[in-house]
Amino acid sequence: MASKEFHIVAETGIHARPATLLVQTASKFTSEITLEYKGKSVNLKSIMGVMSLGVGQGADVTISAEGADADDAIATIAETMTKEGLAE
């Protein structure tokens, strides 16, 4: 299992466009990938799940992956979040 914490810096938080991008990125992997915020954990491959968290600017979230490609999944998601200016 691999996981990484992120601090959301995007002014609008994880709204529709970045949520869609994260779901598309996560869906490329076979691992089970979750997004945790305020004690609630959702499937990062589910747009409805991600949107239901209402993650805003300044939030701290944890993304975890379990499976054969877990390390690659976390690395790719981290790269996407940083590149898109979503998190640091």
Swiss-Prot record:
The modification Phosphoserine is found at S46. GO terms for biological process: phosphoenolpyruvate-dependent sugar phosphotransferase system. Keywords: Cytoplasm, Phosphoprotein, Phosphotransferase system, Sugar transport, Transcription, Transcription regulation, Transport. Pfam families: PTS-HPr. One of its GO terms (cellular component) is cytoplasm. InterPro entries: HPr (IPR050399), HPr-like (IPR000032), HPr-like_sf (IPR035895), PTS_HPr_His_P_site (IPR001020), PTS_HPr_Ser_P_site (IPR002114). It is found in: Cytoplasm. Residues 1-88 form the HPr domain. The active site is at H15 (pros-phosphohistidine intermediate). It comes from the Bacteria. Phosphorylation on Ser-46 inhibits the phosphoryl transfer from enzyme I to HPr. General (non sugar-specific) component of the phosphoenolpyruvate-dependent sugar phosphotransferase system (sugar PTS). This major carbohydrate active-transport system catalyzes the phosphorylation of incoming sugar substrates concomitantly with their translocation across the cell membrane. The phosphoryl group from phosphoenolpyruvate (PEP) is transferred to the phosphoryl carrier protein HPr by enzyme I. Phospho-HPr then transfers it to the PTS EIIA domain. Belongs to the HPr family. This is Phosphocarrier protein HPr.
